[in-house]
Amino acid sequence: MTLFEAIILGIVQGLTEFLPISSTAHLRIVPALAGWQDPGAAFSAIVQIGTLAAVLIYFYKDIHSITRGVFDGLRSGRPFETQESRMGWMIAAGTMPIVILGLLFKTEIETSLRSLYWISVALIVLALMLTLAEWLMKRRADKGLKAKTMNDIGWKEALLIGLAQSIALIPGSSRSGVTITGGLFLNLSRETAARFSFLLSLPAVFAAGIYQLYETRDQLMASGSDLLNLAVATLFAGIVGYASIAFLINYLKQHSTALFILYRIALGVGILGLIANGYLQA
């Protein structure tokens, strides 16, 4: 990988990690279209540490209050007394499914499931699921049912959205896409679904990044250029990722996810067309 490729892929990661369009899909598609080598699942996981930093900075106040609530609850012997402490434990519980399934299906995630064919299918299927979630949300609104806010999230919502997050192990599905979709099915407002999605991502993204750093430590230490390129890609991913978070949170206050649904379908169908005509290898 060249430095130029690292910069481009870092920007791609930052742009697509938080939008419900799948960063893994784009990190697979862009190199394929450009004639570059697939950076691999390990690259994706490590560069996500940059976008993790973006979440930490953007949601600093939320994270600080949640962390303080958890420790205060432990010290007082009442770990679930406050909304902040409960949120911390709910995020931890919601993270368990993706951790367990990620370890069980690590080989498939890094090999066969990275096929452009399966990525295209995942892009389209999740778009249809998101369409259904939007339709249900509109029906509830027409009936006068108010959407839930962060204060309304309970154990049921946290665990079900956590289960939905495990679907993101399939490249092309999108971690933010499946968690936002899960949130909409559970009647969270779009903004709330996105906000909880980003907070829920912290433990899983951190764990995946650290694990892949450990797994590839010998390769990285043996090649200074690989280490530099990875650092540059991670930096660009963090900077662009911060802007993507701000954009999506503000966008969903006033708009539906229709734009992302149309994009996912167009991209998925387009890739299948390129594969069918021999322009891309699955």
UniProtKB/Swiss-Prot annotation:
Keywords: Antibiotic resistance, Cell inner membrane, Cell membrane, Cell shape, Cell wall biogenesis/degradation, Hydrolase, Membrane, Peptidoglycan synthesis, Transmembrane, Transmembrane helix. This is Undecaprenyl-diphosphatase. Bacitracin is thought to be involved in the inhibition of peptidoglycan synthesis by sequestering undecaprenyl diphosphate, thereby reducing the pool of lipid carrier available. GO terms for biological process: cell wall organization; peptidoglycan biosynthetic process; regulation of cell shape; response to antibiotic. It catalyses: di-trans,octa-cis-undecaprenyl diphosphate + H2O = di-trans,octa-cis-undecaprenyl phosphate + phosphate + H(+). Catalyzes the dephosphorylation of undecaprenyl diphosphate (UPP). Confers resistance to bacitracin. It is a multi-pass membrane protein. It comes from Chlorobium phaeobacteroides (strain BS1). GO terms for cellular component: plasma membrane. InterPro entries: UppP (IPR003824).
